[in-house]
Design a protein with these regions (language model features):
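N-terminal active-site beta-alpha-beta segment that forms phosphate/nucleotide-binding
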Residues: 40-127
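Conserved phosphate- and dinucleotide-binding cores of soluble alpha/beta proteins
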Residues: 121-239
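Short N-terminal alpha-helical targeting/association segments
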Residues: 8-11, 17
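SAM-dependent methyltransferases
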Residues: 27-53, 59, 79, 118, ...
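Short, Lys/Arg-enriched N-terminal segments with co-localized hydrophobic residues
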Residues: 15-31
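Cysteine-centered motifs
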Residues: 5-7, 21
């Protein structure tokens, strides 16, 4: 009978209704994903233009696989490579690729702390992310031990940043706020340290012995051509 029909009859919900609903939802999700992709692609062009005006190179990767390919194109085989706690590099598969390939990857976890630090300064390539980047190409990084920001500033011959589009901010003020109120509290959780931001999720401008906000580095220009390369990834990666 019509009353027991699984089809759409007089507003009843049946198997075909649920299937059609799922299809509509899937379509909306795909449309939303495409709009996000287009927005990120357009925004990335602005960021890359800003980077170029600051004597830095920028690239846009549609996904993690494209980001990995771009990164490997920038790293000659045989290179000595160091890293500054870059979760984003791991997320795109770059660390595994380097360990499996013809590269000399400096694993600081297997070295004396001081020896690992000094080896990183003399590396051919230094991998990092940014805690935030402005739409006109200025990068913000916060560091506790300061090994990461010091290698970004000088030492390694080339620095490659892997940056998710989730880290792009309108201006320097919002980039600083993101670094302090998003990246720092998450990293405090990651390192399991005793800071107010770990407990509350926001910055208290603390002077805790465990604070990871010891050094702030704003990278607004590169004096050395071809040293700084930024790969913008159309994905939510890193902190």
């Amino acid at each position: 009978s019509r009353a027991n029909c699984a089809c759409t009859v007089y507003g009843s919900t049946g198997l075909k209704d649920r299937k059609a609903c799922r299809l509509r939802k899937d379509k909306r999700v795909k449309e939303m994903d495409e709009m996000i992709r287009k927005r990120n692609e357009q925004l990335a062009k602005t960021v890359i233009k800003g980077l170029q005006s600051r004597n830095m190179s920028g690239y846009y990767a549609e996904d993690k696989e494209a980001a990995l390919k771009q990164a490997l194109e920038l790293i000659p085989e045989g290179s000595t490579i160091a890293m500054g706690g870059c979760m984003s590099a791991g997320e795109i598969g770059l660390i595994s690729a380097l360990e499996a390939g013809n590269y000399h990857y400096i694993d600081r976890s297997k070295m004396d702390a001081r020896a690992g630090l000094m080896a990183a300064y003399d590396a051919d390539i230094f991998l990092s992310s940014a805690n935030a980047i402005t739409s006109d190409g200025v990068m913000v990084n916060i560091d506790g031990n300061s090994n990461r920001v010091s290698c970004i500033a000088q030492g390694p011959r080339k620095v490659i940043f892997i940056v998710g589009m989730n880290k792009v901010c309108a201006d320097l003020d919002s980039a600083m706020k993101r670094a302090r109120n998003v990246a720092a509290p998450i990293n405090a959780q990651r390192f399991d340290i005793k800071t107010p931001c770990k407990e509350t999720g926001k910055c208290f401008d603390c002077k805790s012995p465990d604070t990871i906000c010891c050094q702030f580095l704003i990278t607004r220009y590169s004096r050395h051509t071809d040293r700084i390369h930024v790969i913008l990834v159309n994905d939510t990666i890193g902190y």
